[in-house]
């Protein structure tokens, strides 16, 4: 058993609002992301509005057909005297998402003048939980973008979901940061980043990706991360 599995469950909030009986696949990153968010939101989830293009069975939504678009949105009015709402984007990406490294969704949220914008990964649950709390408690509208690795679509072992979520962050392919009224702050610093190739090679969906493509993706990662650092 790794240290993550051994220690993390002991320090997470004990309350559970994400019950059994859903149809999520084994190792589903989306289900893990929803579970962590529910631990913070609690009973307020009853006031939430889902916009779910896929994985409908997880949320008890019945439909005849659903297209795997790669994202699900949850909108919740904050309440308790706090004006505004929080929008949470659970991003499990597409099967052949060659633009996996170029995450423009948080930038779009900043451009839309959200008062609080944050990125999170199921591989870093405490950072995720802290950002949900901040998003719920801060004044104005909040937006949280959560990376939820999908074993089925991405092509990795179901027991590697957390590993995929951590590698995304540790390689700077998916940096964790927050933007409060236009001010940037990196919330998880990686002193010695992993190779982007380690993150890519974990995923079967990129098995045909060549060395030259990986080199270009690595350069893109470096450039995008540098942009964020310059804004801090």
PLM region spans:
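Short, solvent-exposed amphipathic alpha-helical segments in soluble enzyme
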Residues: 42, 76-79, 133-137, 159-164
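Active-site lining segments that contact anionic ligands and/or coordinate catalytic metals
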Residues: 139-143, 174
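Thiamine diphosphate
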Residues: 1-100, 123, 127-130, 230, ...
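Flexible, low-complexity linker and terminal segments
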Residues: 150-232
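Short, conserved beta-strand edge motifs with alternating hydrophobic and charged residues
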Residues: 89, 118-120, 143-147
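Conserved thiamine diphosphate
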Residues: 12-14, 21, 100-138
């Amino acid at each position: 058993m790794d240290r993550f599995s051994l220690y993390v469950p002991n320090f997470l909030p004990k309350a559970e609002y994400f019950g059994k009986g859903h149809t999520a696949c084994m190792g589903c990153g989306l289900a893990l992301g929803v579970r962590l968010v529910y631990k913070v939101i609690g009973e307020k989830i009853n006031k939430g509005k889902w916009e779910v293009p896929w994985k409908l069975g997880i949320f008890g939504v019945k439909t005849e057909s659903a297209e795997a678009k790669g994202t699900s949105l949850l909108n919740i009015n904050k309440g308790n005297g706090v004006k505004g709402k929080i929008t949470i984007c659970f991003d499990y990406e597409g099967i052949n998402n060659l633009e996996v490294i170029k995450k423009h969704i948080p930038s779009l949220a900043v451009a839309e003048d959200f008062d609080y914008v944050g990125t999170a990964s199921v591989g870093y649950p405490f950072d995720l939980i802290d950002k949900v709390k901040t998003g719920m408690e801060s004044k104005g509208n909040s937006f949280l973008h959560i990376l939820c690795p999908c074993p089925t679509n991405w092509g990795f072992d179901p027991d590697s979901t957390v590993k995929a979520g951590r590698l995304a962050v540790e390689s700077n392919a998916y940096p964790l940061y927050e933007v409060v009224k236009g001010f940037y702050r990196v919330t998880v610093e990686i002193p010695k980043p992993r190779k982007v190739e380690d993150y890519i090679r974990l995923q079967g969906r990129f098995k045909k990706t060549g060395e030259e493509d990986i080199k270009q993706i690595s350069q893109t990662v470096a450039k995008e991360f540098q942009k964020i650092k310059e804004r801090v």
